[in-house]
Amino acid sequence: MAGKTYGLLGCGRIGIHTAEAAKALGMHVIAYDRYPSQAAKDLGVEFVELDDLFARSDVLGLQMPLMDFNTGIINKENIAKMKDGVIIINNSRGQMVVEQDLADALNSGKVACAGLDVVSTEPIRADNPLLKAKNCIITPHMSWGSRSSRQRIMDCTVENVRAFLAGQPQNVVNK
């Protein structure tokens, strides 16, 4: 992957961690974010306009929450702006992708492959066109779920229960 360009659609906390990993692989990282962070700039992330992101990315990662402006943003019009053979990774929100358009692009070879941890309807429907698309890997919204991540959640839960039982509840939202 060295020398390739990783494009981030969204560069908040998760996007910054993704950028660090991409840079460790020798990739150049560009991003589109309506609110570019200084932390990302300090890491060397180059912020670009949306059309530049689509045109320059060898790998495009979706890393932002679902909003009106990005619902269906991965569609045939924007896929046409992308490099032939682009790789698309979505572990953000399934509704950001027009699934039939992505399936068509995968089957034609315009998109080389896609790694999707989310789809528009979960659990995935049997008639989802991505299930029959070439070079498409779909996981059940579990990309965060490494063994160490699950262990941290269990440890935090135990500590929160202990604190509650000791009369010192943590992370109270209705004080």
Residue ranges and their predicted role:
Residues 1-2, 55-56, 84, 132, ...:
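Residue-level preference for short coil/turn positions at secondary-structure junctions
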Residues 1-17, 44-46:
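Glycine-rich NAD(P)-binding loop of Rossmann-like domains
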Residues 19, 23, 106-107:
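Gly/Ala-rich phosphate-binding loop of Rossmann-like dinucleotide-binding domains
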Residues 21, 56, 160-164:
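Short alpha-helical functional segments enriched in proximate histidine and acidic residues
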Residues 27-28:
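Residues at the starts of beta-strands that form the adenosine-phosphate
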Residues 31:
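Conserved SAM-binding motif I beta-strand of class I
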Residues 34-129:
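Rossmann-like adenosine-cofactor binding region
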Residues 120-175:
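C-terminal helix-to-coil terminal segments
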